[in-house]
UniProtKB/Swiss-Prot annotation:
ATP-binding among keywords: no
InterPro entries on file: NESP55
Name of the molecule in the record: Neuroendocrine secretory protein 55
Record-linked Pfam families: NESP55 (PF06390)
Position of the signal peptide: 1-46
Acidic residues composition-biased segments: 97-125
Family: Belongs to the NESP55 family.
Keyword vocabulary terms for this entry: Cleavage on pair of basic residues, Cytoplasmic vesicle, Glycoprotein, Proteoglycan, Secreted, Signal
Biased composition (Basic and acidic residues): 182-198
Originating organism: Bos taurus
Region annotated Disordered, chain positions: 71-241
Compartment(s) of residence: Cytoplasmic vesicle, Secretory vesicle; Secreted
């Protein structure tokens, strides 16, 4: 009875297990367990990777802030860039002011060009009167200038006077005609002597030589000291009373 009862009990237990967990249900349960485990592992890996990225970003920020203290903020992340774009948009109305500044600069350049043109016109007006007087004397009659024939006449008169004078005759014996001819010359303006006349140039040279001979002072004649001079004799004895 016992031997027959044991296998019967085993069969009954199997039937009961199959009834509770059939083979199809077992396979589905195992698949669900594997899926849940894999999903949990993937989530853990994702969280660890995000944490590692955040740590690396924090380290980069601290490194950049340490080496670039002047920069207060580090380049933002892509999601924050949209907000920054919206922040930069209000700064666009500043463009008209910049255009106005350019317009003012152009007006300043125009005023400078006008000033330069005025200065050039003033310089031209200043230089114009300097050139005009040079052309005017050509058209208008100039001042009365003594004619050349008078100069030649005076030369001929002087030559004739020199010829009349003899080397032996004194200036007191000169004829009155020469004195009369010289008297009107004194009223006239002094004229330049022609250096070609050798006779006229010789006369003033001779007169200068005579004056030099007369005015030369006589040099004091010094007698040579005799061999018996007091300097060589020695000191003069002084008599004491």
């Amino acid at each position: 009875m016992d031997r027959r009862s044991r296998p019967q009990l085993g069969r009954r237990a199997r039937h009961n297990y199959n009834d509770l967990c059939p083979p199809i249900g077992r396979r589905a349960a195992t698949a669900l367990l594997w899926l849940s485990c894999s999903i949990a592992l993937l989530r853990a890996l994702a969280t660890s990777s995000t944490r590692a990225q955040q740590r690396a970003a924090a380290q980069r920020r601290t490194f950049l802030n340490a080496h670039h203290r002047s920069a207060a903020q580090v380049f933002p992340e892509p999601p924050e860039s949209d907000h920054e774009d919206t922040d930069f948009e209000p700064s666009l109305p500043e463009c008209p002011e910049y255009q106005e500044e350019e317009f003012d600069y152009e007006s300043e350049t125009e005023s400078e060009s006008e000033i330069e043109s005025e200065t050039e016109f003033e310089t031209e007006s200043d230089t114009a009167p300097t050139t005009e007087p040079e052309t005017e004397p050509e058209d208008e009659p100039g001042p009365v200038v003594p004619k050349r024939p008078t100069f030649h006449q005076s030369l001929t008169e002087r030559l004739s006077a020199l010829r009349l004078r003899s080397p032996d005759a004194s200036p007191s014996r000169a004829p009155p005609s020469t004195q009369e001819s010289e008297s009107p010359r004194q009223g006239e303006e002094p004229e330049d002597k022609d250096p070609r006349d050798p006779e006229e140039s010789e006369e003033p040279k001779e007169e200068e030589k005579q004056q030099q001979h007369r005015c030369k002072p006589k040099k004091p004649t010094r007698r040579d000291p005799s061999p018996e001079s007091p300097s060589k004799r020695g000191a003069i004895p002084i008599r004491r009373h």
